[in-house]
UniProtKB/Swiss-Prot annotation:
Origin species: Escherichia coli O7:K1 (strain IAI39 / ExPEC)
Complex formation: This dioxygenase system consists of four proteins: the two subunits of the hydroxylase component (HcaE and HcaF), a ferredoxin (HcaC) and a ferredoxin reductase (HcaD).
GO MF, any single term: 3-phenylpropionate dioxygenase activity
BP GO annotations: 3-phenylpropionate catabolic process
Official protein name in the record: 3-phenylpropionate/cinnamic acid dioxygenase ferredoxin--NAD(+) reductase component
Family to which this protein belongs: Belongs to the bacterial ring-hydroxylating dioxygenase ferredoxin reductase family.
Alphabetical keyword list: Aromatic hydrocarbons catabolism, FAD, Flavoprotein, NAD, Oxidoreductase
Amino acid sequence: MKEKTIIIVGGGQAAAMAAASLRQQGFTGELHLFSDEQHLPYERPPLSKSMLLEDSPQLQSVLPAHWWQENNVHLHSGVTIKTLGRDTRELVLTNGESWHWDQLFIATGAAARPLPLLDALGERCFTLRHAGDAARLREVLQPERSVVIVGAGTIGLELAASATQRGCKATVIELAATVMGRNAPPPVQRYLLQRHQQAGVRILLNNAIEHVVDGENVELTLQSGETLRADVVIYGIGISANDQLAREANLDTANGIVIDEACRTCDPAIFAGGDVAITRLDNGALHRCESWENANNQAQIAASAMLGLPLPRLPPPWFWSDQYSDNLQFIGDMRGDDWLCRGNPETQKAIWFNLQNGVLIGAVTLNQGREIRLIRKWIQSGKTFDAKLLTDEHIALKSL
């Protein structure tokens, strides 16, 4: 019996890890990966950090170049797909080539959610999703330049830190009343706001751009009436899923390809993962998780489902952010207002804990990354704690 052919569409973390997971879990059939980028699949997190700060930055490949040949995975780089061929099971490229598939994994990622007012600036306006974006930004982030960043989410704050470290004068504009409002708890939001302000970043909350004039400098008029002048304008206000191919194939989409817990779409032969995917929960709600770890997890889940194997158990959600000399790691549930703090954030060393009826459900570490493994184990086991003991620095965490 002929073995099936699996095609992966995409060139990022989820795409590469799907290929790796399929081979690791025993798939020996024909395996192809199609990407519209010329590079090997590469890590995205460094784009807002080391790719802007290091003297001679290099892209970090998800898998080494030799892995693809050794594992007999056919890479098709720099190609554009015309149709997925859902009915015919034939992927068609814009160059006329067609490729048969039995199962499909879509990991086409996402683009920056557009902001037409700033997009009208053309090359004077920047977003950050790909290696080419980072290369362009690196050229313009020069000392003493005035940089305006719209959006105070994770990427916006990382860009503010990198721009400041490159000698720029950074201003961040945020519509909400706080920074990192979607994915950090209140005490961490307050810490980050103060950290950036101490570094010289001006952060304007509860504000937005109303008018833009492109001249020698870019003039931005805010809702507050203030006018800012910028040499460089960057924005990051969310994502727009690259789900056009899926929509044209009549898959279920909602600013992302809708998947179930097995990463399966409404077509049982088509799977999706990473930033392009959005999961329908048991209660019918749609949930998106934009992180490096989620891309890895969904790649592994999809590979298992495609091969008819048991699905792996998911660890608590985890992501990290490097800003200035700080490394922050977020694990578990970030919801809730009653967070406990161990240590002193003013010394750039602390852990915030989220207890619910004594059970640890989430945590954020500040330059304490070595504790994440233990905290992950606690969250997975549903361990309960005495709040006083948990926050007492004289008691080693591993003894609790």
